[in-house]
Structure formats: structure tokens, C-alpha cells
Amino acid sequence: MKTTHTSLPFAGHTLHFVEFDPANFCEQDLLWLPHYAQLQHAGRKRKTEHLAGRIAAVYALREYGYKCVPAIGELRQPVWPAEVYGSISHCGATALAVVSRQPIGVDIEEIFSAQTATELTDNIITPAEHERLADCGLAFSLALTLAFSAKESAFKASEIQTDAGFLDYQIISWNKQQVIIHRENEMFAVHWQIKEKIVITLCQHD
């Protein structure tokens, strides 16, 4: 599968992007993965995204001196070396990965259409959050995409993985660089940026 790697400094970390072309994917490409047998029953889309995500993760791990491919955990999560944390996300034909010494989460999303935003609003934010988003100065579809992505990154960065849903992660404040999110006894500062029609969020949880 043809891939292109780029990197971008963001919020004190380096994001590693892998653009990939699903059209020229073949099953033999998966043999690069030590755990390729675990993907034999996956669909083509899942296989291409997984492969690109692991390629991005390998680039991210090289920063810290590791030469390994994250395995698949019991909950289908990436398994990182014991001394580091990492996160992977996908959007369209782009995979993104980041590695850190602290718990970290990253997410990449295409900006919702107005119709999608309307359909998903009640599943992502509470009425109180809706008011905060209305005052943030962004178009609502963009603001909701950002809220969704920020909550995804906060969830990934949380050391306590629970069955908490989007509405359990409450946006309490917002500025041009960060979204502050509260869940039970935890606070999350989520950095964000817009890149063309894409929203990228990153949360490092100290």
C-alpha cells in the first residue's frame, strides 16, 4: 500500500501523519505487522486503516528509540512499550499517531456537515454545553466537531478507562487554543487546531 509520512509539531509533541491509498492495498501488505493473523477476518477498510495507523505509530515510537509495532490489546487498543503512552486516530485516507511519556490522546475528524451536526448534537453535548458552543464564535458544525474530537482525545488520555459516554465529559471552558473538559474528579486540557477541513485535538493528561 502506498503511503506518505509527514510530521507536525503541536502542543509540545510531534504528530506523525501517514496518508495512504486504499486502492492499491493488497493482503500481503499486512505481513509487515507481527499480528497480521488477528486481522484476517477484518474488512478491507479496517485493514487499510489499521496498517496506516501502525505505520504512523512506528514513526512516532522512533522518536523515543523504539523499533516495534504496537500489538492489539484485549479491548482492540494499541499496546505500547511499558515506558511510554501513545494514541492513534484515522480520518478518511489519513492516519495519525503520537507518543509521549505521559498519558495522551489524539483525534482527527473531518468537519461535520450541517445535517450531521444536527443529527448528532444530543449524543455529544448537553444543553449547557450547547450554550457554551453557541458563544465560542465558530460555526456550529465546526464547534460540534471540535467538541466531539476533544472528548475523544480526553477519553483516550484518561488512565481510568470506563464506560463513560460523551455526555459524561463536560466542556467547561473554551479558547482559541484549548478546550477544558471535566469528568468526575478529572480535568483535561485539550489542544486543538483546524487544518483545512480537518479538526485535530490532543490531550496530555498529567
From Swiss-Prot:
It comes from the Bacteria. It catalyses: apo-[aryl-carrier protein] + CoA = holo-[aryl-carrier protein] + adenosine 3',5'-bisphosphate + H(+); apo-[peptidyl-carrier protein] + CoA = holo-[peptidyl-carrier protein] + adenosine 3',5'-bisphosphate + H(+). GO terms for biological process: enterobactin biosynthetic process. GO terms for cellular component: enterobactin synthetase complex; plasma membrane. Keywords: Enterobactin biosynthesis, Magnesium, Membrane, Metal-binding, Transferase. InterPro entries: 4-PPantetheinyl_Trfase_dom, 4-PPantetheinyl_Trfase_dom_sf, 4PPT_N, Enbac_synth_compD-like. Mg(2+) binds at residues 107, 109, 152. Its cofactor is Mg(2+). Its EC number is 2.7.8.-. It is found in: Membrane. Pathway: Siderophore biosynthesis; enterobactin biosynthesis. One of its GO terms (molecular function) is magnesium ion binding. It holds the Pfam family ACPS. Involved in the biosynthesis of the siderophore enterobactin (enterochelin), which is a macrocyclic trimeric lactone of N-(2,3-dihydroxybenzoyl)-serine. The serine trilactone serves as a scaffolding for the three catechol functionalities that provide hexadentate coordination for the tightly ligated iron(2+) atoms. EntB, EntD, EntE, and EntF form a multienzyme complex called enterobactin synthase. Belongs to the P-Pant transferase superfamily. EntD family. NCBIfam families: PRK10251.1. This is Enterobactin synthase component D. It comes from Escherichia coli O157:H7.
